[in-house]
């Protein structure tokens, strides 16, 4: 038969008829690729050995890159900024950042306290300072007016220590004479040679009418010395400069300019 050799083997023509064309093409391609790889291995190169392995690893890495990119794209969907925004809104806001070195708590309290005081003073729009001013004004109006004391120095014969009398606390000559007696009664008793007791302290009487041992006189703004009680009380208070308690026996020598002036003031 045709297609068979003498030895009984199948001829190439018969093989071509039996094997399909696609199988034959694939077979030739595989055969050629095997020959090519063997030829590459047998080729002489100037580079060091191992470069072929590097080339193969590069090819493998290039094939894996699209797979890695697909994985990253899937991961990006789950960890996108839009998803992180929703979680960030749920978190509580962080506290204020403390500088370095850290400020101690009591210094913070002092600073906050001072800043709050300044804020209260400056907030006139809320009416805080205006209310405080109104309260102060009301307190001033409700408080009684305190007049300045009219203190006048007073000296007594035989007593080296002088005292002061507040004329604004007196309304008449009788009150003034009582105050003078109270001030100098004990001092006169202490000036005596023998020791004195409370019973030995005698009241000082006749200061205004000249019937006692001592008489009360005063010096006015002009330097004139006159008897206390010869002019109205308000006139006396407005013109008195200093008070003196002298002996009644020395009135004539002490009141050098007082008699004529007192007569004019009486008129």
UniProtKB/Swiss-Prot annotation:
InterPro entries: AUX/IAA_dom, AUX_IAA, PB1-like. Induction: By auxin. It comes from the Eukaryota. The keyword ATP-binding does not apply. Keywords: Auxin signaling pathway, Nucleus, Repressor, Transcription, Transcription regulation. Residues 81-101 are annotated as: Disordered. It is found in: Nucleus. Residues 149-248 form the PB1 domain. Signal peptide: none annotated. Coiled coil: none annotated. GO terms for molecular function: DNA-binding transcription factor activity. One of its GO terms (biological process) is response to auxin. GO terms for cellular component: nucleus. A motif (EAR-like (transcriptional repression)) lies at residues 42-46. The keyword Transcription applies. Aux/IAA proteins are short-lived transcriptional factors that function as repressors of early auxin response genes at low auxin concentrations. Repression is thought to result from the interaction with auxin response factors (ARFs), proteins that bind to the auxin-responsive promoter element (AuxRE). Formation of heterodimers with ARF proteins may alter their ability to modulate early auxin response genes expression. Homodimers and heterodimers. Interacts with TPL. Belongs to the Aux/IAA family. The N-terminal half of the protein contains two conserved domains I and II. Domain I includes a slightly degenerated ERF-associated amphiphilic repression (EAR) motif which seems to be involved in the activity of transcriptional repression. Domain II is required for the correct degradation of the protein through the SCF-mediated ubiquitin-proteasome pathway. Interactions between Aux/IAA proteins and auxin response factors (ARFs) occur through their C-terminal dimerization domains III and IV. This is Auxin-responsive protein IAA18. It comes from Arabidopsis thaliana (Mouse-ear cress). The lineage of its organism: Eukaryota, Viridiplantae, Streptophyta, Embryophyta, Tracheophyta. The gene is IAA18.
């Amino acid at each position: 038969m045709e297609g068979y050799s003498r030895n009984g083997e199948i001829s190439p023509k018969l093989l071509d008829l039996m094997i399909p064309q696609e199988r034959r093409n694939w077979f030739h391609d595989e055969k050629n690729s095997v020959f090519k790889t063997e030829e590459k291995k047998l080729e002489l190169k100037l580079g060091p050995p191992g470069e072929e392995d590097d080339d193969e690893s590069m090819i493998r890495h290039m094939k894996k890159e699209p797979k890695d990119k697909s994985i990253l794209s899937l991961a990006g969907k789950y960890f996108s900024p839009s998803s992180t925004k929703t979680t960030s809104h749920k978190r509580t806001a962080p506290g204020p950042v403390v500088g370095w070195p850290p400020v101690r708590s009591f210094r913070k309290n002092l600073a906050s306290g001072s800043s709050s005081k300044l804020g209260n003073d400056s907030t006139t729009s809320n009416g805080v300072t205006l209310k405080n001013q109104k309260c102060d004004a009301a307190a001033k109006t409700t408080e009684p007016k305190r007049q300045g004391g009219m203190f006048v120095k007073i000296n007594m014969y035989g007593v080296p220590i002088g005292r002061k009398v507040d004329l604004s606390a007196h309304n008449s000559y009788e009150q003034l004479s009582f105050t003078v007696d109270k001030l100098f009664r004990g001092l006169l008793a202490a000036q005596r040679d023998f020791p004195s007791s409370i019973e030995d302290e005698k009241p000082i009487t006749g200061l205004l009418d000249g019937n006692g041992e001592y008489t009360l006189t005063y010096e006015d703004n002009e330097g004139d010395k006159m008897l206390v009680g010869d002019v109205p009380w308000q006139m006396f208070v407005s013109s008195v400069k200093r008070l003196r308690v002298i002996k009644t026996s020395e009135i004539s020598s002490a009141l050098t300019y007082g008699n004529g002036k007192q007569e004019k003031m009486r008129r």
